[in-house]
């Protein structure tokens, strides 16, 4: 969020009661608490509703006289970003199908106000073949993962993290795989246990995310060329970056 703000973007952070840090704080078994929340269908739906609510509220406040957000939110240039369960949330907000759930009253998916998504540790779809699950996705997506980004709950492999990028077609995408990065490397939640407090890759991730948003939201040709060229100067030896259906 700090990197976005420093680059001139409004950055809003959304809390998800029932599936956020509160579920493991004070818990005797953080892993069990996380797993229970991850497989709770009602919490999944609540997360998607939270995303829609956050967009509603941001746009409402941007139009309200005297509000700090007044005039600061460009409704035509909104993106959503998240890590792990947050990545799952982003993927569905921009169009990934929800198997077996059908229409959710009061919730429009994909959310037509989103123009891009960023998924840190993307999540492979469950219950549908990937190409069917991702067929409705029509907005640019940046996927960031690591060579050791295995799942603690769903037994995801590092290769699974690349499935959204491999399965989505027809829209600009970028995939960054950071050498040595684990699932926890993108979280930096020391209070959740040592697995979530790995040395972070935040500087590289933040720089990639800013370049991606500049390229797809601001139509910044220099940022688009930077990513198309492998982002020299942003990545470390052993990292790799791919683009797909990229506008350069």
Features from the language model and the residues they span:
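Short amphipathic alpha-helix adjacent to the substrate-entry channel of hydrolases
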Residues: 1-15, 21
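Alpha/beta-hydrolase active-site loop signature
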Residues: 18-20, 124, 182
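Alpha/beta-hydrolase active-site loop
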Residues: 28-75, 92
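Short mixed-charge
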Residues: 57-74, 99-112, 221-222, 226-229, ...
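Residue in the alpha/beta-hydrolase core beta-strand immediately N-terminal to the catalytic nucleophile
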Residues: 77-79, 118
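Gly/Ala-rich beta-loop-alpha elbow adjacent to hydrolase catalytic centers
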Residues: 82-86, 90
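The feature captures the conserved acid-bearing segment of alpha/beta-hydrolase catalytic domains
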Residues: 103-180
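Alpha/beta-hydrolase-fold serine-hydrolase catalytic core, especially in secreted/extracellular enzymes
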Residues: 179-182, 188-248
